[in-house]
Amino acid sequence: MNTIKTVVFDLGGVLVDLDIDRCTGAFRSLGMDAVADLINPYYPAEMIGRLEHGVISFHEACDEMRRLSGTPEVTDAQIAWAYGQFLVRIPVAKLRQIDALRERGIRTCVLSNNNPASMKYIRRMFTADGKSMDDYFDAVFLSYELHELKPSEAIFR
């Protein structure tokens, strides 16, 4: 008999391999050195924290990044691309492990501090094994949708 009923995964650094140097290099290639200096996967800068908290939209965050770096010509799409460079891959072996848990009757969920732009890239990564993200999880809890950030107690309720 299974005593484990549910496994909750994080995305960045757990399921999704990250490359901070690739991300900061992408921002620097856009002339956004000031933004590159703020990138940290585990301790987001205040502005990125507000984006992940769902307090500001992606467009509003882009406006702040352009102001901060003095690059009004950089588009939202370019910023999304640069931010997406953080996200490398989801190894297929991890997807198969999630499948194995589900085959044993274990519920699988995601709880992640994230933002809408990154989620577009992440959702595509789940298709590497021919499925969608929703095929792997019973529930997906994202900070920007819940308007709460880990590790706050409220996000776990």
Protein language model regions, located:
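N-terminal helical cap/lid subdomain that shapes the substrate entry/recognition surface
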Residues: N2-R96, E103-R104, N115-P116, L142
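Generic structural signal for well-ordered alpha-helices
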Residues: L95-I98, F156
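Structured helix-beta-strand junction loops
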Residues: R104-G105, Y136
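Short beta-strand/turn micro-motifs composed of small residues
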Residues: S112
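Substrate-recognition "cap/lid" segment bordering the active-site pocket of phosphatases
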Residues: P116-R157
